[in-house]
Amino acid sequence: MRLLALGPLPGMLIGASATVAAGVAAAFFFASRGLMALDLDVGRSIHPLGPITLRIRAPRDLVFDVVAAPYLGKMPGSMEGKIEILDRHGDLVVALHRTALPVRDAITVESVAFERPERVTFTLLRGPVPHVREEFRLEDHEGETEFTYTGELGADLWALGRIYGGRIVKPVWEKVVRDSLAQVKAAAEERAAARGRRVERSTEDEGRS
């Protein structure tokens, strides 16, 4: 009788576990798509992002302009479909970011604050985790730029959050940041080189006149 009484229990547990797992997977899917915010504020773990440091062979003001252009100026063609401005008040912007991932695009909504020429800060409003704060710091070094990225990411639900936030979201997030910063570096250095060539031609023209 005991065996008969316990017989259905493993199946019930498996079914319940599968239901919970499916619910968690669905919640994470909708959060990654920016369709819901998983902000329970229970059992939260904080994971550092970065630091990531780059030396960019371009003046600080030019690097800042490259970072700010999609938010405060004309949207570059390379950013079309990746960034959508939802609201703007001076140097504070609310933007939707769409990032291509192997399975499906991830969508986040963030506030972005610009403090020219040394700092840009990002605060997550909606996305795959309840808490992300990031900072770009730009320091001038003899006409070049020391670019440093730092931040933190928070996920809820104790051990589940530590695994999800620290082992799943963080590596993907930092890879996206590294790829983005590589694009900033390339664009800034290309513009700096073009500016240098214009100055050189102007100097040569003045010398011939």
Feature locations, PLM:
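Hydrophobic ligand-binding cavity/cleft-lining segments
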Residues: 10-90, 208-209
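Short, highly charged C-terminal tails/helix-capping segments
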Residues: 35-39, 181-209
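Short, surface-exposed coil-to-beta transition loops
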Residues: 51, 104-109, 130-135
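Beta-strand elements of well-folded, non-transmembrane domains
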Residues: 56, 99-103, 113-115, 128, ...
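A short, structured loop/turn motif at beta-sheet edges
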Residues: 57-61, 88-89, 113-119, 137-146
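Hydrophobic pocket/interface hotspot
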Residues: 62-67, 73, 95, 111, ...
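Short beta-edge strand/loop motif at the mouth of beta-sheet-based domains
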Residues: 70-106, 114-117, 201-207
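Beta-strand/loop substructures that line and gate deep hydrophobic ligand-binding cavities in soluble
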Residues: 123-178, 184-186
